[in-house]
Amino acid sequence: MALGDPYATPDDLKARFDIATSDTVDDTRLGEALASVSREIEAYCERQFNTDASATARVFRPRSSGVVVVDDFHTTTGLVVATDEDGDGVYETTWDAADYQLEPLNGIVSGQSGWPFRRIVAVGSRPFRCDRRPSVQVTAEWGWAAVPAPVKEACLISAAEMFKLGDAPFGVAGFGEFGPVRVRMNSRAQSLLAPYRLHPVLVA
């Protein structure tokens, strides 16, 4: 799936309701629900899970002279790490692969494989330059190699709820004892997405 695509298809969602794939009456509403929920997942997790098929350049500020945290990228194919050595906005120095290490190592987080790279660690003699300007330019195929199964499931759970609610005006699903009940992300979906949040909320 390309960047910006929903994390599940209308046919996936139809299966939740035992709707035949040949029945296209609700395809528009199903697609809108999936697209809306997918963007909500991205906002909740502060990352996106699809794949950019071509390498593009992005710039970053290092956290220190030894580490720069970047957006998720899933392959070293087309990867270029370059730095601006004098703060002029020109990334004139291209690093050799031996100059840096990509993390998480082996694409494993908490025992689960399939995670993209997100940190670049300087392991040679060359440090990252820390400045007000972004001093590191990374050209990469951004995103994940595949949408994680829990993310797809969270998308389907929430999209199914949204589809069943229909056109809830102003996000109001109904009225309870204390007033209007607002539509919010399903708690099961939140649980599935918890490991993928960049900045999880800590509860004391």
Language model: regions and residue ranges:
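Divalent metal-cofactor coordination and adjacent catalytic microenvironments
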Residues: 1-204
